[in-house]
């Protein structure tokens, strides 16, 4: 199971390059600490143009160890000071955790299209069965479906495919 932490920001007008460079700098620092981190751009929908910072961990134990590593680092203190002194973006979606419930993230499939569904928790077994059917259809056209469920956030009834 992969645990993903995400944070989505909207760059201030004229500061998109600065924000992207700041995020790439943090991504490198996380990599130096042994943490897998990525920056992506939202292309469609209400958050088009936003940047997403994501980290990936194999399980919750690793994810929490990574959080502890980051928050106790000197690098993170510098990032916080930079955010206070020269903000280059506004937070659109604060830091949240999701987990992979079915499928797997693959580096060969770098473009993602999220569909969000509101689902009662007691319907999750049915969704898992349907996911296997969707996965079979997607394999025919080289699409890699992944089912994500929220761990934190506003609405824990959402699933992401």
Predicted segments, located by residue:
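Surface-exposed beta-loop interaction hotspot
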Residues: 89-124
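Conserved small/polar residues in nucleotide/adenosyl-binding loops
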Residues: 159-161
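Short, surface-exposed ligand-recognition loops at beta-strand->loop->(often short) alpha-helix junctions
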Residues: 10-20, 118-128
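A short, glycine/Asx- and small/polar-enriched loop/turn
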Residues: 47-51, 154-157
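Solvent-exposed loop and beta-edge segments used for protein-protein assembly and interaction
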Residues: 1, 47, 107-109
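Active-site-flanking beta-strand signature of metal-NTP-handling nucleotidyl enzymes
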Residues: 2-10, 52-54, 111-117
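Short, flexible beta-strand-to-coil junctions
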Residues: 8-12, 57-58, 120, 151-152
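An amphipathic, aromatic/His-enriched active-site/gating alpha helix that lines ligand/cofactor pockets
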Residues: 17-39, 44-47, 56-93, 129-147, ...
């Amino acid at each position: 199971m992969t645990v993903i932490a995400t944070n989505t920001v909207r760059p201030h007008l004229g500061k998109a390059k600065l924000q992207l460079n700041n995020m790439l700098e943090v991504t490198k620092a996380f990599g130096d600490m042994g943490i897998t981190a990525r920056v992506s751009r939202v292309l469609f929908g209400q958050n088009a143009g936003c940047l997403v910072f994501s980290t990936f961990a194999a399980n919750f134990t690793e994810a929490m160890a990574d959080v502890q590593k980051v928050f106790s680092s000197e690098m993170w203190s510098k990032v916080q000071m930079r955010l206070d002194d020269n903000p280059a973006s506004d937070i659109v979606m604060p830091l949240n955790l999701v987990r992979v419930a079915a499928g797997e993230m693959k580096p060969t499939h770098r473009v993602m299209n999220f569909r969000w569904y509101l689902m009662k928790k007691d319907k999750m077994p049915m969704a898992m069965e349907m996911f296997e059917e969707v996965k079979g259809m997607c394999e025919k056209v080289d699409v890699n479906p992944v089912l994500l469920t929220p761990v934190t956030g506003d609405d824990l009834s959402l699933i992401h495919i």
